[in-house]
């Protein structure tokens, strides 16, 4: 796995390079600005580029489209400190083709001492490097003399996907629940846009997207602008209303409380669930208890298995759960876990999920 690091801090470049090497990956280049990174692309051919936003000469936002044009398919992860400005820029970079973002501690000391930052960085290199390797064209083998090549070990058969029978409760949906992580900001926006604002105005939309604080508020603003509906982080005791989009705040679990006809947002700072806070499972468990069969949920692209236990609660309550397919997922962790557990009524490409959800919401599903 080949990695390029572009950051104007020599301390950050050195630390990150050391961590990546210790994890068993190869650092093929480091760059102090976007211009050097761009000039190094053809020579070094990285699988993953870690691209800082704020750099001299050519910053990350300027370099990103040029890097992608020069090396289509390279996996670019944006890095930035937790500010509203950088959150907004990072989300815009995702729309331009970056695969993910990584919140960076504000100081070099913070970078040095943050085990969380190190773990998240290595995990992204591992996941996106593997994704890039799968998509690379395989070169023809060079002509050699008689060489015995050991047979490859047999591949483990893929886990068969068994779809859950369609719910036949006769209870129409009263809300839409969305869980997502890596690759989610783009996916969520596309799904909501394809459902359409006319349909979304009739239902509350509750979203758990794995994101740090600050980013979730900006993410909500982007969604609201895209679909033309009020969208914001959920607030404690805020009443659930149709036509509004509620995003779980970074660093806090978002659930539901009250009775079926008088529901409100519940926020808590409890322990992480599935290594996450906010966690999809927290929202889904509450929705299963309070909406029951009147909930409709979808799990989109993301690492890990968050949402699987909550999806089980929803299906046991009679609700329908859909999942994104592997081919269109940035990472088929969360949706794959739900699909392999037999909890998904349908496993669909991203482009088909919006229309399918619209049909279920409006009662026009086959």
Show which residues each predicted segment covers.
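Conserved acid/base catalytic micro-environments in cytosolic active-site loops
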Residues: 2-4, 9-21, 30, 35-36, ...
